[in-house]
C-alpha cells in the first residue's frame, strides 16, 4: 500500500498524518476484502510505503527519514522508568522524505 504526498513546506508531523491516512486506508482494505480481524487466523495486509516529495525553501537533505516515535513525549514517571530500562514505543511509522528541488535526487527526477 503506497502513500505519496507532495509538500511545499517542511512538516515534522507527516508521520502522524501518515498514521491517520494508513489507519483509514487499512480499514477500507479490510472491509473491501471482508477480512476478519477477530479470527484466530492471521490476516495478510499489503506492506505500507510512505513517500513524501519535498520542494520547499528550507534546506533539507536529499533523503530524510521522519519517524512517528520522534513525536512521542514521555511523562516524568516514564522518564524515570526510561532511565531504569530502555522503553520503546509499541508503534512506529517511517515516512521517507525525498527532496525534489533542483540539484537534488537527480536520478529520480530523470524518471
Predicted regions and their residues:
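Conserved single-residue anchors adjacent to enzymatic active/cofactor-binding motifs
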Residues: 1-111
Amino acid at each position: 500500500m503506497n502513500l505519496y504526498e507532495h509538500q511545499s513546506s517542511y512538516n515534522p508531523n507527516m508521520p502522524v498524518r501518515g498514521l491517520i491516512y494508513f489507519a483509514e486506508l487499512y480499514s477500507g482494505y479490510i472491509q473491501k476484502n471482508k477480512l476478519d480481524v477477530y479470527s484466530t487466523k492471521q490476516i495478510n495486509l499489503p506492506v505500507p510505503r510512505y513517500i513524501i516529495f519535498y520542494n520547499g525553501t528550507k534546506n533539507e537533505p536529499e533523503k530524510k527519514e521522519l519517524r512517528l516515535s520522534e513525536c512521542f513525549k514521555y511523562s516524568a514517571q516514564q522518564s524515570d522508568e526510561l532511565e531504569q530500562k530502555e522503553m520503546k514505543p509499541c508503534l512506529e511509522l517511517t515516512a521517507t522524505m525525498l527532496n525534489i528541488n533542483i540539484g537534488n535526487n537527480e536520478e529520480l527526477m530523470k524518471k
